[in-house]
């Protein structure tokens, strides 16, 4: 079953784009967080998944070769519908939302999923830090809390990234303004020089 769109989909996608993280190269900061999530939850697979308009893209992953999947089969597309809660699916073959999902019915045969939403300060769900297994199971309360804490760490790093991007943009604008001022100054000096030449000639 394909997940419905969040009520704030337009603002959510705009917020995701503002972080400028889609299709970027792997970074050890995020790779470390999925390794920790996998270890704490005891799952073979952990992902940082960002839900774009028609796909989910993985900023970091362990236990999975793919870098993205179609949004219509994404468990995380369901998780972002309620950004304040972890979506837990103990056995996907017994959940009407996922039983016919090709990632469940076919390869890789997902059975268990838990996704902690990545939530902006404004409340938009960008994606999840999620863990998956290929046998039915569940997480202990302390594992769920740890998954949420790690998801907050992901968002803190994304926020820092966004602030750095904003600072760099501001610096580029300042540099552009300085170049324009320098060009204007040179133009004034040239005009002044030409005026002096004409005055001297006259």
Regions found by a protein language model. Give the residues of each.
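Signal-transmission linkers at sensory-effector interfaces
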Residues: 1-28, 173, 187, 194-197
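Short beta-strand-to-loop transition segments that serve as allosteric relay/switch motifs
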Residues: 128-137
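Glycine-biased flexible loop/turn sites that connect beta-strands or occur in inter-domain linkers
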Residues: 48, 123-124
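Regulatory sensory and allosteric helical modules in signal-transduction proteins
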Residues: 14-15, 45, 51, 55-61, ...
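Amphipathic alpha-helical coiled-coil "transmission" helices that mediate dimerization
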Residues: 162-201
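Helix-loop-beta substructure at the N-terminus of cytosolic sensory domains
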Residues: 23-56, 71-72
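A short, aliphatic-rich beta-strand micro-motif
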Residues: 111-122
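Allosteric cytosolic regulatory segments
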Residues: 148-155
């Amino acid at each position: 079953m394909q997940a419905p769109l969040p009520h704030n989909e337009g603002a959510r996608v705009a917020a995701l784009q503002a972080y400028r993280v889609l299709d970027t190269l792997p970074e050890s900061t995020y790779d470390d967080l999925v390794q920790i999530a996998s270890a704490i939850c005891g799952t073979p697979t952990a992902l940082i998944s960002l839900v774009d308009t028609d796909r989910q893209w993985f900023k970091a992953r362990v236990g999975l070769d793919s870098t993205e999947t179609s949004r219509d089969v994404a468990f995380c597309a369901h998780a972002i519908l309620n950004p304040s809660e972890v979506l837990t699916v103990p056995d996907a073959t017994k959940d009407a939302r996922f039983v016919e999902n090709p990632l469940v019915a076919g390869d890789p045969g997902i059975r268990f999923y838990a996704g902690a939403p990545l939530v902006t300060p404004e409340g938009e769900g960008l994606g999840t830090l999620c863990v998956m297994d290929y046998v039915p199971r569940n997480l202990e309360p302390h594992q769920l809390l740890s998954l949420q804490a790690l998801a907050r760490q992901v968002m803190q790093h994304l926020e820092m990234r966004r602030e750095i991007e904003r600072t760099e943009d501001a610096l580029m604008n300042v540099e552009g303004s300085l170049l324009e001022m320098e060009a204007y100054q040179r133009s004034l000096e040239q005009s002044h020089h030409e005026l002096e030449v004409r005055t001297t000639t006259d």
